[in-house]
């Protein structure tokens, strides 16, 4: 996860790099100094890490026409992956019914089950929930993408309909996990709520440059990452004996898998009609490294909260550097990147880069694990400052 969480800008052949070169700018790592981080901790709407020199609108004008022409395809191939509201699960389906006579007994039973779950698992579950709760940021991010954004807030275009409906489906995830953890009594809800507010106020910097090629590559990767993460928290919950929590996490994972299918279909179509630019975009995102959506996470105390949460997730096997490599390898195979033909020289170099990257990531991870020392134990405000090993 530590590898997956990193995010640096780096040279590539996609449109954003051409813009960087034309502006005479070099790629930068957007990390504030310790002094700056101390200062920003006193500013309630500023992230602990400031983001600088963001590339904007790297999509060439002629590429935008592709997304206009894909509207009929998107209507036929994306909207059928959404579930009607009346057939969708809702958070209340998994929680004690407050109107029933047995409500208090059900809550007591839930709290008894939660007592058997260790703090490090709750750190992972809270981190996943906080990530889900920053949904306004993700809808905003999708609506920065040229050619597919919701221009009015209620646009009838297929891309806009998809984004709003996707957001509506995702909204249930954070709601359900939030209510469940509130009922457990195991976590500091005020600290969690502060973390959510900080995160939404901070935004995110995925490096997608208003470019839907980059944006849909990013969402393809992220939906698979969240599918894996929620699937692993479901497995752990079952091992701890909380079958209801396992069901909750598994149900959320199933949604993420369906959304992954949609976004990977979009990129598959882009590879079909515009393979050279798409493989350049793929290499661009992987050179930058995929930043996790909550990489600007902050709780008002820990300037490195996301890295600490990621380290616990890595140790527990909830989401790891190996998962990052596996996702990349899965996408390369899913999109048949190795089989692409007729590419430009730059396209062939990008193809080689993405097709050989996963094994390199695994080797780096193996070396890092071999050198790893005993991880420190630090307090997490989410669990009342109890100490958890990283």
Swiss-Prot record:
Residues given in the record as Fe cation 2 binding sites: 170, 223, 256, 259
GO annotation, cellular component aspect: chloroplast
GO molecular function: metal ion binding; stearoyl-[ACP] desaturase activity
Keyword tags: Chloroplast, Fatty acid biosynthesis, Fatty acid metabolism, Iron, Lipid biosynthesis, Lipid metabolism, Metal-binding, Oxidoreductase, Plastid, Transit peptide
Protein name: Stearoyl-[acyl-carrier-protein] 9-desaturase 5, chloroplastic
Subunit structure: Homodimer.
Location of this chain's protein in the cell: Plastid, Chloroplast; Plastid
Function: Converts stearoyl-ACP to oleoyl-ACP by introduction of a cis double bond between carbons 9 and 10 of the acyl chain.
Gene3D superfamilies: Ribonucleotide Reductase, subunit A
GO biological process assignments: fatty acid biosynthetic process; fatty acid metabolic process
Domain of life: Eukaryota
SUPFAM superfamilies: Ferritin-like
């Amino acid at each position: 996860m530590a590898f997956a969480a990193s995010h640096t800008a780096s040279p590539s052949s996609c449109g954003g790099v051409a813009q960087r070169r034309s502006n005479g700018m070099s790629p930068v790592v957007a990390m504030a100094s310790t002094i700056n981080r101390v200062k920003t901790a006193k500013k309630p709407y500023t992230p602990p890490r400031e983001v600088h020199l963001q590339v904007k609108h790297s999509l060439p004008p002629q590429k935008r026409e592709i997304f206009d022409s894909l509207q009929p395809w998107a209507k036929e191939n994306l909207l059928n992956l959404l579930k009607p509201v009346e057939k969708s699960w809702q958070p209340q389906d998994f929680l004690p019914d407050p109107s029933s006579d047995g409500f208090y007994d059900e809550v007591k039973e839930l709290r008894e089950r939660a007592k058997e779950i260790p703090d490090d698992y709750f750190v992972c579950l809270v981190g996943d929930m906080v990530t889900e709760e920053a949904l306004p940021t993700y809808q905003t991010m999708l609506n920065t993408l040229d050619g597919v954004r919701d221009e009015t807030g209620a646009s009838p275009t297929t891309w806009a309909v998809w984004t709003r409906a996707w957001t509506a489906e995702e909204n249930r995830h954070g709601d359900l996990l939030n209510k469940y953890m509130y009922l457990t009594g195991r976590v500091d809800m005020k600290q969690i709520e502060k973390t959510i507010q900080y995160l939404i106020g901070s935004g995110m910097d995925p490096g997608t440059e208003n470019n839907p090629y980059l944006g849909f590559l990013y969402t393809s990767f992220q939906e698979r990452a969240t599918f894996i993460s929620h699937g692993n928290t479901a497995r752990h919950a079952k091992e701890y004996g909380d079958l209801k929590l396992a069901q909750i996490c598994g149900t959320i994972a199933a949604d993420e898998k369906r959304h992954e299918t949609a976004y990977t279909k979009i990129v598959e179509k882009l590879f079909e009609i515009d393979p050279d630019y798409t493989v350049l975009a793929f290499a661009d995102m992987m050179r930058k490294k995929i930043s996790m959506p909550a990489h600007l996470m902050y709780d008002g105390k820990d300037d490195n909260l996301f890295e600490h949460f990621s380290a616990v997730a890595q140790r527990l096997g909830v989401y790891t550097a190996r998962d990052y490599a596996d996702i990349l390898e899965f996408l390369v195979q899913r999109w048949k990147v190795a089989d692409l033909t007729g590419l430009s020289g730059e396209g062939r170099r990008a193809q080689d880069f993405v097709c050989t990257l996963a094994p390199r990531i695994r080797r780096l991870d193996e070396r890092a694990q071999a050198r790893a020392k005993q991880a420190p134990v630090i307090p997490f405000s989410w669990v009342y400052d109890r100490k958890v090993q990283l």
